[in-house]
Amino acid sequence: MSTIPTSGHIPVMLAEVLEMLCPRDGATYLDGTFGGGGYARAILGAARCTLWAIDRDPAAIRRGQALQAELRDAEGGMRLHMLQGGFGDMQGLLAESGVHSLDGVVLDLGVSSFQLDEVERGFSFRTDGPLDMRMGDTGPTAADIVNTMGESDLADIIYEYGEERMSRRVARAIVAARAQAPITTTFQLADIIRSVVPGDRSGIDPATRSFQGIRIHVNDELGQIVTGLEQALALLAPGGRLVVVSFHSLEDRLVKQALNRAAGRMPGPSRHDPRSMRAEQAAPDFRLLTSRALRPGETECRANPRARSARLRAAERLAVPDTQNSTHNNTSPQERRP
């Protein structure tokens, strides 16, 4: 095990991620969401491996470059390589550097703790900052969206991505408020939402779901997940593993569906769905390492409340397609511990 400089950033479910990824010497891995570098440090510390890391946030790239410098000082070599961009573009980004196959991929979905804590990024309604919400430094901001989007479209993204039942009411209030003055800060938007969405016994701030919906739209987060999962699975060599940590039901649903498809665990044929009545399906190339999503323990949740909603799923590319676990045989493959 290597000695890697430590960081104050504590990634969610780190022990479980490492157990599922099972880093080994000489292998090549990808951290598709570098963020604070917590997973990257742990992977590099667990084995003498090479790690490529992607993030679209310039601040994350700077943190990665600082870690590169620390590693050079500590080891005299270069095992960490940083790439700026979205993980949904991982194949193209890696191909430009001559990388076409990986032994493992880790994805930590959603907004990072650093982004939430940096007031000027405009992700949080708990502090007043500019209404930005971009994970990168290009594209429309949240302020652009809430001040220009039509009421119906605004309601749709808040409902679909934020799962806010009162989305129509929220959109109407936003449109009425912006007619008086532009909405430019997180406090402004949060107050508008709270004026029409009552609190409930859960203690969740009434602005939470609407902020989530707008943020997901601004960053095309679900689109990134769909393409990122597809590309990650395609890049994995036999024995390669994909480990994904998600934080809300929309993310977890996409991950579950993608991994189940890869492992051949799709619903059986139905006479009500002609598309399902196919005579034969190709043997799956993957097996699930998690029959259901893993969740953080209570100790971790007490130490880091943001971990409470985390879900981890993982899969491994098989050396030989599994002819015993076709689409028409939905028996779960026996889990093996890494």
From Swiss-Prot:
InterPro entries: RsmH, SAM-dep_MeTrfase_MraW_recog, SAM-dependent_MTases_sf. Residues 322-338 have a biased composition (Polar residues). Signal peptide: none annotated. It is found in: Cytoplasm. Keywords: Cytoplasm, Methyltransferase, rRNA processing, S-adenosyl-L-methionine, Transferase. GO terms for molecular function: rRNA (cytosine-N4-)-methyltransferase activity. GO terms for biological process: rRNA base methylation. One of its GO terms (cellular component) is cytoplasm. Its EC number is 2.1.1.199. Pfam families: Methyltransf_5. It catalyses: cytidine(1402) in 16S rRNA + S-adenosyl-L-methionine = N(4)-methylcytidine(1402) in 16S rRNA + S-adenosyl-L-homocysteine + H(+). It comes from the Bacteria. S-adenosyl-L-methionine binds at residues 37-39, 55, 87, 108, 115. Residues 261-284, 299-338 are annotated as: Disordered. Belongs to the methyltransferase superfamily. RsmH family. HAMAP family: 16SrRNA_methyltr_H. PANTHER family: 12S RRNA N4-METHYLCYTIDINE METHYLTRANSFERASE (PTHR11265:SF0), S-ADENOSYL-METHYLTRANSFERASE MRAW (PTHR11265). Specifically methylates the N4 position of cytidine in position 1402 (C1402) of 16S rRNA. This is Ribosomal RNA small subunit methyltransferase H. It comes from Gluconacetobacter diazotrophicus (strain ATCC 49037 / DSM 5601 / CCUG 37298 / CIP 103539 / LMG 7603 / PAl5).
